Amino acid sequence: MNYTRFISFTVLAAILSSCEFNEDFCIRNGELVAWCDFSGIRETPPVPEERHIIAFPSGMDIPSGEQMTFTQDTLRQSIPQGEYQFLFYTGNYEVSDIRDYHEARLMARTDTLEGEVYISGVQKFCCSAGFSQRLEYQRPKRVPITPSAFVQRLNIQINVSGNITPLAGLQGTLTGISTGRYLVSRERTGNASVTSLFSRKPETDRWKTSLYAFGFNPAAENILSVKIEMDGKDSVFNEEQKVDLTPYLRGFDSDELSLELDLHIGKELTIGEPVVIPDWEDIPETELPNYN
């Protein structure tokens, strides 16, 4: 008889059987069953692969900040039983300080060009939520998640007049954009600029753009630089004008803001003061130009 294997099996059996009598002796898993209620969200719900939950255990000797990603509309995850605080967010964002419940924050990707920091690409809509739950062995906990918007949307419409025939495009660059936001406190951090292309609504002289951002840095100015791009030989007349949006964006804490400006192309490029507009209509995707 192999006494070494017999003794090992006996010890293992004793350990396994002891779990039936001593809850502190071994780790038992509880099950979290979570799904999202997006009824309060106007935007299209994100695909399952863009939904994430971060788990923060309380009083347990297991790592904090473990992230779970939805691969279906409902998340079913087996993790050690106990008290947890959970943070939920959507989108493909970097999470900084993911191990710290209060310091965890989403970060937008940035690039530095000639010493200036810019948001990379286009930020997408993002929503978030937080909840607490105690998970117990063999008692699945079913939790509906009701997120709220975690980004702000800024819409800008420019009404162009004057010498518009050679106008090929409008580009805007806005300063004072927050690059990160804490998931718990929702405070904003960082400072960068973002560049956005305007699209012309067919058969009109109205050019529109929309952008999502974590918010606007309260210590920075929000200067919008509008650059006109002319066709062909008229490109020598490409110009840029600036307008201060700080009075509208500083302290702005709602989900969405829409502004309208007048731009006149003549001997000089002139831009008017912004006006807040109550309703915003997106240009349908079928009417957007194809830049490919």
Q: What positions do the PLM features span?
A:
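C-terminal motif of bacterial Sec signal peptides marking the signal peptidase cleavage site
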Residues: 15-18
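Tryptophan-paired
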Residues: 52-100, 167-248
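A sequence/structural signal for flexible, mid-protein segments enriched
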Residues: 116-208
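A short, Gly/Thr-enriched small/hydrophobic beta-strand-prone motif that recurs across taxa
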Residues: 23-42, 146-161
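Hydrophilic extracytoplasmic domains
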Residues: 225-292
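A short beta-turn/strand-edge loop motif at beta-sheet boundaries
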Residues: 42-49, 162-168
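Bacterial N-terminal signal peptides that target proteins for export
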Residues: 1-7
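Short, low-hydrophobicity acidic/polar segments
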Residues: 63-149
